[in-house]
């Protein structure tokens, strides 16, 4: 499998970004038997990914006096641009969403990614319920960011808070994906299995920072 650079980004908190990060990293490690995975966590508030010992994630310090400092992203991107033999999975908290997008724009990062050997993906989560509109807005901002570049979006549809739907039609069944096929490289559905036992197991897994 080709090495890749993966950012998990969504401006809405509590939608499952760190869960998606853990699942993605485990997929690379267990299903593809890759031992060149670099996992990072930029969240200055909730270092959820760092707590999962098996992922051996690095805490990427991007704050100073409780403020996100854009220049602190520099070492992370330098590592990505100079280590094509690695696959990167970077978990980003809600508070880093806008600063990181600003960093992308200010430093022409999309242009830089045109020259890297790895594929580059931004993974974003869309949920149902009250947070649907906010997560769709986050998607739209990322869509504008990657438009016209080699960077593609992976949409994670998380049914934990309800099935994301537009006009009572599940998002996955609407023309949403087709309409945005120029920027979407794939879709992952985190299904609501409607099982108390399954939900309890997942809750215990995440609370104890375990892997599958």
Model-derived regions, located:
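A generic secondary-structure signal
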Residues: 26-27, 31, 79, 141-145
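Preference for solvent-exposed, low-hydrophobicity sequence contexts
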Residues: 199-210
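Glycine-rich phosphate-binding P-loop
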Residues: 8-24
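Extended hydrophobic secondary-structure segments that form protein cores and membrane-embedded regions
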Residues: 7-8, 24, 39-42, 121-126, ...
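A conserved segment at the C-terminal end of the G1
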Residues: 19-39
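Conserved catalytic-core segment of NTP-binding enzymes
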Residues: 96-192, 196-200
């Amino acid at each position: 499998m080709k090495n890749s650079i993966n950012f998990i980004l969504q401006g809405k908190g509590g939608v499952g970004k760190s869960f998606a990060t853990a699942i993605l990293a485990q997929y690379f490690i267990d299903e593809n038997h890759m031992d060149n995975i670099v996992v990072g966590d930029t969240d200055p508030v909730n270092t959820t990914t760092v707590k999962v010992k098996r992922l051996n994630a690095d805490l990427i310090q991007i704050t100073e006096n409780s403020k996100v400092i854009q220049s602190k992203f520099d070492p992370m991107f330098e590592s990505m641009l100079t280590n094509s033999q690695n696959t990167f999975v970077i978990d980003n908290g809600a508070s880093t969403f806008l600063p990181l997008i600003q960093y992308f724009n200010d430093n022409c990062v999309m242009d830089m990614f045109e020259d890297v050997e790895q594929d580059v993906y931004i993974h974003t989560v869309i949920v149902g319920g009250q947070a649907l509109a906010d997560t769709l807005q986050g998607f739209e901002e990322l869509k504008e960011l990657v438009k016209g570049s080699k960077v593609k979006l992976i949409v994670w549809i998380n049914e934990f808070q309800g099935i994301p739907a537009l006009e009572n039609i599940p998002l996955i069944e609407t023309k949403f994906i087709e309409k945005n096929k120029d920027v979407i490289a794939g879709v992952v559905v985190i299904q609501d299995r409607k099982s108390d036992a399954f939900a309890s197991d997942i809750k215990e897994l995440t609370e104890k920072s375990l892997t599958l």
